[in-house]
A protein has these predicted regions:
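C-terminal interaction module
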Residues: 219-270, 275
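Structural boundary/hinge residues at secondary-structure and domain interfaces
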Residues: 28-131, 136, 187-205, 260-301
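Hydrophobic, Leu/Ile/Phe/Ala-enriched alpha-helical segments that form helix-helix packing faces
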Residues: 80-84, 215, 253
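Secondary-structure transition/turn motif
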Residues: 122-123, 145-147, 161-164, 239-244, ...
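Surface-exposed flexible segments
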Residues: 126-137, 163-174, 241-256
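Secretory targeting signatures
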Residues: 1-39, 157, 301
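An internal, short helix-loop-strand segment that often contains or flanks glycine-aspartate motifs
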Residues: 41-55, 61-63, 87-94, 137-236, ...
């Protein structure tokens, strides 16, 4: 016959086993029963280069990949994101997950007003946006809040000023063509897994360079991108399309340095294990300006 203490111990053990079983069922239920809210996607592009082409008519682009695990790049990306995320529009957005973002700013349409948008790669997960009204535009659902809007069923998802968002929908749907010139430059960039990138076009690109004796714009396209090399260290690409007789030349600014030219488009590929050196590295350039020689006729007899 079992003693009272043994009976009590058996009951406690049975209770513990029952709790473990219930806990296992709950864990299984949460793992298998919960799914991230998803959305329908009507138009979609994948890959950085194809995404950049959709906003190739903008004047300034930033690309930030939040999936990088490199601490140096994470710090650089966080610094840019901290600045961008101060925008008032983020009062109206809530994400379930974000892989990367492209920020595109367009030339001003009036004094002090620059249309802009954020493209968020969220896969098929849902983005929550506080809105006052909703409308259909070329088969895409637009949610509107004052001067801000979100194109919901596209990927990357677009959030920004309404005019910029509608321009993006026009492009991703094929209604509007991309900027062929800048899209062609983007196509020629080395196919790396960029984690951070900056693109400037038109006058925004030309403002970063000044040369004595030059007349008119020097460049109309600037790209700078950084990637983590699989074998260690970092790769950096800088590309510029020159409007005058300017070109990249050989240099030893990094451990590895190479220049490729496609007509006036100059591309410098750099590699180094020193992150600070990679971040600050710029290609060396040469300029050739031909000046007319004034003819000295002297005195005629």
């Amino acid at each position: 016959m079992a003693k009272p203490l043994e009976k009590k111990s058996a009951k406690i053990l049975a209770l513990i086993l029952a709790l473990i079983m219930v806990g296992s069922v709950l864990v299984y239920a949460f793992k298998g029963g919960y799914t991230t809210p998803s959305r329908e996607v009507k138009y979609s592009v994948s890959g950085l280069r194809d995404t950049l082409k959709l906003v190739s008519d903008s004047s300034k682009i930033y690309y930030l990949d939040f999936r990088t695990e490199d601490p140096n790049l994470t710090q650089l990306i966080d610094a840019y994101w901290q600045s961008l995320s101060q925008d008032y529009i983020f009062r109206y957005i809530r994400f379930t997950s974000v892989n990367s973002t492209v920020y595109a700013e367009y030339s001003p349409v009036s004094i002090g007003y620059y249309p802009y948008l954020f493209l968020f790669d969220v896969g098929s997960s849902k983005v929550f946006f506080t809105y006052d009204e909703k409308q259909e535009y070329d088969g895409v659902t637009l949610k509107l809040k004052g001067s801000y809007g979100m194109a919901e069923n596209v990927n990357p998802i677009a959030v920004g000023t309404v005019d910029a968002v509608m321009r993006y929908v026009d492009t991703i749907s094929g209604k509007k063509k991309v900027n062929i010139t800048y899209a062609e430059y983007i196509s020629k960039l080395p196919d790396l897994e960029y984690r951070f990138a900056v693109i400037l076009t038109g006058s925004s690109a030309d403002q970063i360079i000044r040369m004595n004796k030059s007349a008119g714009p020097v460049t109309d396209f600037y790209f700078e991108g950084i990637a983590v090399n699989d074998t260690g260290g970092y790769d950096k690409v800088i590309a510029m399309n020159f409007k005058q007789n300017v070109f990249f030349v050989k240099s030893n600014v990094t451990a590895y340095y190479n220049v490729t030219r496609y007509g006036d488009l100059n591309i410098a590929f750099m590699h180094d294990t020193n992150f600070t050196k990679i971040v600050t590295a710029k290609p060396e350039m040469r300029a050739v300006f031909i000046e007319p020689v004034e003819e000295n006729r002297g005195n005629e007899s």
